[in-house]
Regions:
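Proteins enriched for Cys/Gly/acidic motifs involved in redox and nucleic-acid/cofactor modification
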Residues: 1-210, 249, 264, 285-297, ...
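Conserved beta-strand core positions
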Residues: 5, 42-43, 153, 200, ...
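Generic beta-strand/beta-sheet core signal
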Residues: 8, 82, 203-205, 239-241, ...
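Radical SAM enzyme [4Fe-4S]-AdoMet core and its adjacent flexible, acidic
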Residues: 12, 211-232, 278-279, 342-373
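Conserved SAM/AdoMet-binding glycine-rich loop
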Residues: 76-81, 88, 194-318, 328
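Short acidic/polar active-site loop segments enriched in Thr and Asp
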Residues: 101, 198, 234, 333, ...
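Conserved, mostly hydrophobic/aromatic
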Residues: 165, 185, 202, 238, ...
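Terminal RNA-binding accessory module
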Residues: 350-454
Length: 454
């Protein structure tokens, strides 16, 4: 029997890691991955429904993939939906989407091959759902089949979240925070380095409390030091660390470990204390200001990325003005803005004074305009500097390549456009002198024979 499988992964980088693990399990059990869904016997869609837009994309993708069940279009004998969508809506799922043959929940990924076998055996409407607080399955990470470029990979260090933000459905779908064992993470990172991974990007719903559940205290600093010692890794990058739980020990490890990029993604969500309180956040403007100051004191060259939500229920003109002032004051190096999404089943969805969509979008545009000016000024300061750049590809134009510095995360931050008379290859580290700056990107030329001082 043919056992070809096609995979579509939606949503965040954490979802991508889950997809890579599932694909590895399927291959271990005799399935062959194909890029063309029309050739697949089984199609898996790993879904996201964190916000309304993600939910709509997931449903559209499922319906798009279902067309391959038509013999005139494809060979699909089973459509499996994995991840958040099935976990969140499992009771009504098959009534709403009868095209789907099985759902696999957020803690049941290790059963993906078993489910695929059942579908090929003729079973219908299979549900594989476990408790959302199920302990992490540590052994499957070594089976991952990377879907990223071969020189970088994400390392998912925990699952779930202990925060109870009033706007967020993640704890309902992913459960409480559960850390992976330290030694398992080091083993997986070592295997990734042996496969050629040079940049390791650490992710979780909340990375800053890693280890607290297993070891009685946050152990992110210990993990960073252990990863720093792995031969072959060049850059280690930290995402999704929250200011209220980011420890002095972690900051010290970031500053002292030479492979750890002076970069942090630290979502603050808002800059007004009253809004933060309504959001259920445990931070404050003062705490955020102090934590940013500590990071910049320890690492003057650090790039701090953050994320904001505008248009939260009850956000007044005064509160929004306070947010604008805070963004102008803090001058975050990288910043993204979401318009608040009213999510069914959350506390915030039932709050009074919901903000009109038009107002949300206006406020989002205002913050992004402020950040654009900040980013352009920061980019201008890079002109004349000599930076290490990781090459990611080549433009159609002759001798123009693109890459990233230590201050830029893959897929979300700016690029450096590099001129070189010699051919450069994805995964190369090159030295570049910056000659021009855009609003978010840099332009420069390769410099040969330059050595960075320790």
């Amino acid at each position: 029997m043919s056992r070809k499988i096609a995979f579509t992964s939606l949503g965040c980088d954490k979802n991508r890691v889950d997809s890579e693990v599932m694909l590895g399990i399927l291959q271990q059990n005799g399935y062959t991955a194909v890029a063309d869904a029309a050739e697949a016997d089984i199609i898996v869609v790993n879904t996201c429904c964190f916000i309304k837009d993600a939910l709509e994309e997931s449903i559209e993708t499922i319906l798009e993939m279902s067309k391959y069940k038509n013999p005139e279009v494809g060979h699909c004998k089973g459509l499996i939906v994995a991840g958040c969508l099935g976990q969140r809506y499992e009771k009504e799922f098959f009534d709403e989407l009868p095209e789907v043959d099985a759902i696999v929940g957020t803690t049941a990924y290790e059963s993906i091959a078993e489910v695929a076998d059942e579908i090929l055996g003729g079973k219908e409407q299979v549900k594989q759902l476990e408790s959302i607080d199920l302990a992490m399955q540590d052994g499957n990470g070594k089976l991952r089949v990377l879907s990223t470029a071969p020189y970088f990979a994400y390392l998912k260090i925990s699952e779930g979240c202990d925060n109870r933000c009033t706007y967020c459905v993640i704890p309902q779908m992913r459960g409480r925070h559960r850390s992976r064992e330290l030694e398992s993470l080091v083993e997986e990172a070592t295997l990734l380095a042996q496969q050629g991974v040079k940049e390791l990007v650490i992710v979780a719903q909340d990375t800053s409390i890693y280890g607290r559940d297993l070891y009685g205290k946050p152990m992110l600093d210990v993990l960073l030091r252990r990863l720093n010692a792995i031969e072959g890794l060049e850059w280690i990058r930290l995402l999704y660390a929250y200011p209220e739980t980011l420890t002095e020990e972690t900051i010290a490890a970031m500053a002292s470990c030479e492979k750890v990029c002076h970069y942090i993604d630290m979502p603050i969500q808002h800059g007004n204390d009253a809004v933060l309180k309504r959001m259920g956040r445990k931070s404050s403007q003062t705490l955020i200001r102090e934590k940013v100051a500590r990071l910049r004191a320890a690492m003057p060259d650090i790039a701090i990325r953050t994320t904001l939500i505008v248009g939260f229920p009850g956000e007044t003109e005064e509160e929004f003005a306070n947010l604008q002032s805070f963004v102008q004051e803090m001058k975050f190096d990288r910043l993204g803005v979401f318009s608040y999404s009213q999510e069914e089943g959350t506390v915030a969805a039932e709050m009074e004074n919901q903000i009109p969509e038009e107002t949300k979008e206006e406020r989002r545009d205002i913050i992004m305009d402020i950040q654009k000016s900040i980013a352009a000024a920061l980019c201008e300061k890079e002109v004349g500097k000599v930076l290490e750049v990781l090459i990611e590809g080549k433009l159609p134009e002759e001798n123009i390549f693109c890459g990233r510095t230590r201050r830029d995360a893959p897929e979300i931050d700016g690029l450096v456009f590099v001129s070189s008379e010699e051919e450069l290859y994805s995964g190369d580290f090159v030295t570049v002198k910056i000659r021009e700056a855009g609003d978010y990107d840099l332009m420069g030329d390769v410099v040969y024979g330059y050595e960075f001082s320790e």
